[in-house]
Regions:
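Short, acidic/polar
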Residues: 48-64, 137-145, 199-208, 285-295
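Active-site neighborhood of glycoside hydrolase catalytic domains
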Residues: 139-140, 149, 156, 169-198, ...
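Glycoside hydrolase catalytic-domain groove-lining segments
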Residues: 188-272, 323-327
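Active-site groove signature of glycoside hydrolases
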Residues: 112-116, 140-172, 305
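Aromatic-lined substrate-binding rim segments of carbohydrate-active enzymes
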Residues: 55-65, 69-122, 171-196
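Surface-exposed, active-site-proximal loop segments in enzymatic domains
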Residues: 75-89, 113-133, 163-171, 268-278, ...
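Boundary/entry segment of secreted carbohydrate-active catalytic domains
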Residues: 22-67, 73
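Substrate-binding cleft of secreted/luminal carbohydrate-active enzymes
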Residues: 155, 258-331
Length: 332
């Protein structure tokens, strides 16, 4: 009996210590609203999939919303849709217009970049040996960096997008050695910081953060699970992200931490433009939008890139609902 009591004592001591450690590790700075900054991710592909004039949308983002931080993607399948035949016009134009608006640019390069299907490889690489694929990938990255590295508005290079998020997207298995080669290549070409990103809810962060000058996390609360065939609300509080940040800091030392993808659009079993408004509202209504902004402010981050600017514009121009566009405009 005494042994049982002793075991129970040890258990409670361990539990108290464990809970105390969680309390300590979930602490962190919560910045004042005036210290926060916001940007967006823009995808030409996403704008086109919504039936929008992507250039008109982009100009409105810069001139009407007055966004001063923007993440752009150098999609390999668009830049080099045919081997050695490069089409730079669209990316050049996006960078030029953002620079004219004096916006800071994060330029993402690699095979895996923002927006579905996650990986954006040109079709011509499908039937060539893996070693040659890797060589061609590095060549496209080198050409992209060299073409744009003299632009002072580019503040960082993002290498790949959520490379450690497995089982999501139509992507090959992660090759860590290749990822490290990509990062080393970009560092050899330019001294601006490297952004490496990871899933906020589904990944461990440490492998990505160890490779990053700037670590970027995603932040979602309402999604659709194909596995469960239902909508899912993550039962997490802002302290969850502070906890992960503090744990990750024990094993890595990025110079900067940002929320690179803050949910600000719906997520459903099919593309959201195919869903009725009532179903879109399940994962992103105006109230959820406001709540997400308030939630994110308490997570211990101070720089956020919202995910969904093309959707706000689509709601406004196609559906006559300008509320999201107007609400987002208050942040910039």
């Amino acid at each position: 009996m005494f042994k049982t009591i002793k075991k129970i004592k040890y258990f409670y001591v361990f539990l108290i210590i464990f809970l105390f450690l969680i309390f300590l590790l979930s602490r962190g700075c919560v910045y004042d609203k005036k210290d926060l900054s916001y940007g967006v991710t823009f995808s030409l592909k996403q704008a086109e999939s919504l039936g929008l004039d992507w250039q008109e949308t982009y100009i409105s983002i810069l001139n009407d919303l007055k966004v001063k931080k923007i993440r752009l993607a150098a999609y390999w399948d668009e830049i080099e849709s045919e081997k050695d035949n490069y089409g730079w016009d669209d990316l050049d134009w996006q960078i030029k217009k953002a620079s004219e608006a004096n916006a800071e640019i994060i330029l993402a390069v690699g095979g895996r970049l923002p927006r579905w299907p996650e990986c954006h490889f040109p079709k011509w690489i499908e039937n060539i040996p893996q070693a040659e694929k890797n060589k061609q990938l590095l060549e496209y990255i080198e050409l992209t960096i060299n073409r744009h590295k003299n632009n002072k508005n580019i503040v960082a290079w993002q290498v790949e997008n959520e490379p450690f998020l497995i089982n999501f997207g139509e992507c090959p298995k992660l090759d860590k050695g290749l990822l490290d080669m990509e990062i080393a290549l970009v560092k050899s070409l330019d001294n601006r910081p490297i952004v490496v990103t990871d899933s906020g809810e589904l990944s461990a962060w440490v492998p990505a953060a160890r490779r990053a000058d700037i670590f970027g996390t995603t932040m979602y609360r309402d999604t659709y699970s194909k596995l469960l065939r239902s909508y899912v609300h993550y039962p997490i509080e802002p302290g969850f992200f502070r906890f992960k940040k503090n744990i990750t800091r024990l094993f890595s030392s990025p110079e900067k931490w940002v929320v690179i993808e803050l949910q600000a659009e719906p997520w459903g079993p099919v593309p959201f433009q195919e869903l009725p408004k009532k179903e879109r509202d399940i994962t992103m209504s105006l109230d959820k939008f406001k709540d997400m902004i308030d939630f994110s402010r308490k997570t211990g981050f101070k720089e956020f890139y919202l995910w969904g600017v093309e959707w706000w514009y689509w709601e406004w121009k196609v559906n006559g609902d300008g509320r999201f566009w107007e609400e987002a405009g208050k942040l910039f």
